[in-house]
From Swiss-Prot:
First-level EC class: ligase
Domain of life: Bacteria
Binding positions (substrate): S97, H98, N99, H100, R119, Q243, E315, S316, Q317, S563
Protein name: Phosphoribosylformylglycinamidine synthase subunit PurL
A GO term for molecular function: magnesium ion binding
Chain sites annotated for binding Mg(2+) 2: D120, D271
Residues that coordinate or bind ATP: Y55, K94, N523, G560
Single GO BP term: 'de novo' IMP biosynthetic process
Family: Belongs to the FGAMS family.
Gene3D superfamilies reported in the protein's UniProt record: PurM-like C-terminal domain, PurM-like, N-terminal domain
Length: 779
């Protein structure tokens, strides 16, 4: 018989508001339980039926994604995805968000975001080997955004540095839409250390349920529900919903768990992340098609007089739930205690498909597992048939709407005066969204574990060395993995379908640019309210674009995260949604990391080449140039031909692996001119470029984005071999793909000629100063 702990006397409307549930939800809960829930049970349903936990608004759209592939070992549904990267090695990876917590408590919100994603990785039996992050903030001319950036970066650095996992790469962008709602997405990679992948499904009725890790407190209570609602002017009052992490306990937890997993004595494992003990127990039971009973009196706690509601909804960090072999309990507890961790048997696996919770001698919750975890509500929304009128109007924009170019200068619609192209390049380089992120990544330890091949900012994708493969060989060969996180949210805002295709294509292109083969993705879908028809249309269109690109590029989705209700409401109840931001985390494999290349030029007189697609649009529409120089966010983003995209990447990868290409850099934000400038800055070398243009819009040639384009350099010592490679592959070239020489590496100046006219002449020293100091000047 359930004891309602006197909490059956509660204000239903207030409780539903707190739990972010509707009256229809409540009626459905009563129907499933065949009775009214008590307050504790209502809280359990609140977190488990939140968008954060059950994807109730996005589940129908996620089914569009391809999830199977030749290298995929574990897809969506487990703690993280797993792929085969060759040589009997398995990579575990996933991306998660901690947006709302970071908005109100940036240091702890970001820090615990790192801790949470690391637990997803090592819960599968993998040692975390790298972290990347994708961050979004409002423009830095507002002091509150500077404070948020400082706090988030400090939190990520603190947790990652202390736990001993390198932060190897990432991206960051600034836009006014994120001023009230920053985005903090963290991706982690791990290498499997156990013979078998550790899964979460409970097995064997009667097996003990073991609690391991930190103690349980009141921090983070209701965090999942908080993450599934919009931010308002009163959100600072929700600081208790933000967890507090301890990276040193996490480090002990990593070592202890991997040690325990290797014994084979752990049957199932689940970390206590969102919704804490409620979610971990319900998912373990549901995934094993069994039940779990838990006695809260046995849960290690750090505070007195905690209620069952607080125990079950606490999101205290660094906690795990295991199903273990009964005869190995003593050995396991001793092992965990040795690492300074709490370990306590708090329940057992039961044969009935339900979660039963007792506290102080009474049953306080008894819920079918399917009701909590499997058969959760789905909110179906109508998708509008046509794009919103304001977008259709923006799609009408043409480059001819821009001012004419006179005497190698162009009038800025933003600043109402003329600038030379050299001045425009310097202005774009100093914009925080394009400028060096050195101030940020220098705070991260990117070299711990000694397997980081390129420091952040040096290459288009991070590259991490894996274990030595042939220990008997005199020539040590190390395989590696590459990873990149990407999203041009401006493109997605202007066309969610095309923009999302571009996000997948760019993330794959970045991985290919270091010489790795793109294998699979994890995604983090950051969107506004799905209850708004435009917001849901954006989400639906984005999912369609991701699905199409992943199928074409053969990079299946292994899992990820959906973060909705990313919008802020001011004191006048005016809602500001973020730009839709589907962040793509791409992973790739490379058989020999010695073959991987970076983005900077190598030697003077090396040739500079360009590859791209005629079928893919190349336009200044939706470009950084249009926004940052002319002050306009308009136009339809470039359309990418995925067949040509795939060919360009494959052709370049093979050239890299044949040691013909010595540097490579994709053309994205800022177009060709900025890509050239960045390679000059990274190498402290110049470039002499000669281009031809039939049309009179020089700005298109310099600053247009799209076109599946990559610049790369060929060693002057390898030019004969390069031309032989070109000749051998000529028969396979689609007529729509071009590859052409555009210049050579020089000493200390970026010089660009178009149709034999001097367009740009900037010393690398000047480029570097503008590029490196933009963000640091705010601190």
């Amino acid at each position: 018989m359930i004891n309602h702990e006197n909490n059956d006397l509660f204000d239903l409307n207030e409780a539903l508001k707190v739990e972010n549930l509707t009256l229809n939800d409540y009626e459905e809960i009563c129907k499933r339980l065949k009775r009214k829930p008590n307050r504790t049970e209502l809280g359990m349903f609140g977190v488990m039926w939140s968008e954060h936990c059950c994807y109730r608004n996005s589940k129908p759209l996620l089914s569009k994604f391809p999830t199977k592939g030749k290298n995929v070992l574990v897809g969506p549904g487990e703690n993280a995805g797993v792929i085969d990267v060759g040589n009997n090695q398995k990579l575990v990876f996933k991306i998660e968000s901690h947006n709302h917590p970071s908005a109100i408590e940036p240091f702890q919100g970001a820090a615990t975001g790192v801790g949470g994603i690391l637990r997803d990785i090592f819960t599968m039996g993998a040692r975390p080997i790298a972290v990347l992050n994708s961050l979004r903030f409002g423009n830095l001319d507002k002091s509150s955004n500077v404070d948020l950036l400082r706090g988030v970066v400090s939190g990520i650095a603190h947790y990652g540095n202390c736990v001993g996992v390198p932060t190897v790469g990432g991206e960051i962008d600034f836009d006014d839409s994120y001023s009230g709602n920053p985005l903090v997405n963290v991706m982690a990679l791990g290498l499997l250390e156990t013979e078998e992948i550790v899964c979460s499904g409970a097995k064997n009725v009667g097996s003990p349920v073991l609690y391991v890790g930190n103690t349980t407190g009141r921090d983070g209570v209701g965090g999942a529900s908080f993450a599934s609602s919009e931010l308002t002017t009163t959100s600072l009052d929700d600081r208790p919903a933000v967890q507090v992490g301890d990276p040193f306990i996490e480090k002990s937890l990593i070592e202890a768990c991997l040690d325990a997993f290797k014994t084979g004595d752990v049957i199932a494992a689940q970390d206590m992340g969102a919704a804490g003990l409620t979610c971990s127990s319900a998912e373990m039971a549901a995934n094993g098609n069994l039940g779990i009973s838990i006695d809260l009196d046995l849960v290690p706690s750090r505070e007195d007089d905690m209620s069952s509601y607080q125990y079950l909804l606490s999101e205290s960090q660094e906690r795990m739930l295991f199903v273990v072999k009964e005869e190995k309990i003593s050995d396991l507890i001793e092992k965990f205690n040795k690492w300074g961790l709490y370990a306590s048997v708090i329940g057992e696996v039961i044969g009935t498909n339900e979660v039963i919770i007792s506290h102080k001698g009474n049953i306080v919750a008894q819920i079918p597992t399917s009701a909590l975890s499997d058969d959760t509500p789905v909110n179906f929304h109508n998708v509008i048939n046509n794009p919103p009128d304001d977008l259709l109007n923006k799609w009408e924009w043409k480059e001819n709407d821009l001012p004419e170019i006179n005497e190698q200068k162009i009038f800025s619609l933003k600043e109402n005066k003329k600038f030379s192209f050299s001045e425009i390049i310097l202005k774009l380089l100093s914009n925080p969204s394009i400028a060096s992120k050195r101030w940020i990544y220098k705070q991260y330890d990117s070299q711990v574990q000694a397997n980081t091949v390129f420091t952040p900012g040096k290459s288009d994708a991070a590259v991490v060395r894996l274990r030595e493969q042939n220990k008997k060989s005199k020539n040590k060969v190390f395989s590696g993995v590459a990873a990149s996180v990407d999203c041009n949210s401006r493109w997605v805002a202007l066309d969610p379908f095309r923009g999302s295709i571009a996000a997948v294509a760019e993330s794959a292109r970045n991985v290919s640019c270091v010489g790795a083969e793109p294998v699979a993705i994890t995604n983090n879908l950051n969107f506004s309210s799905p209850e708004n028809e435009i917001g849901y249309w954006q989400l639906s269109s984005s999912c369609n674009g991701i699905a199409e690109a992943c199928k074409a590029l053969e990079t299946p989705v292994t899992g990820g995260n959906v973060s909705l209700y990313n919008e802020s409401k001011n004191k006048d109840n005016l809602i500001t949604p973020i730009n839709p931001t589907p962040v793509i985390g791409m992973v790739g494999k490379i058989d020999n990391v010695e073959k991987a290349i970076s983005s900077e030029w190598k030697n003077i007189e090396d040739q500079i080449w360009l590859i791209g697609s005629y079928k893919s649009d190349t336009t200044t529409a939706a470009s950084s140039y249009l926004e940052y120089f002319h002050g306009e966010i308009t136009g339809r983003p470039p359309k990418i031909d995925l067949s040509d995209e795939k060919f360009c990447q494959s052709f370049l990868r093979n050239a890299i692996l044949n040691s013909l290409v010595v540097s490579s850099h994709d053309i994205s934000d800022g177009g060709l001119a900025i890509a050239l400038a960045e390679s000059c800055i990274l190498s402290a070398r110049g470039a002499t470029i000669e281009l031809e243009k039939d049309l009179n819009r020089v700005d298109n040639l310099l600053f247009a984005e799209g076109g599946s384009r990559i610049i790369f350099s060929i060693s002057k010592m390898k030019q004969n071999e390069w031309f032989n490679y070109l000749k051998q592959n000529q028969i396979n070239f689609p007529s729509s793909v071009y590859v052409k020489k555009i210049g050579y590496v020089s000493s200390d100046t970026l010089k660009i000629k178009i149709n034999e006219k001097n367009i740009c002449n900037i010393r690398v020293e000047e480029l570097t100063e503008k590029f490196n100091n933009s963000i640091s000047d705010y601190f």
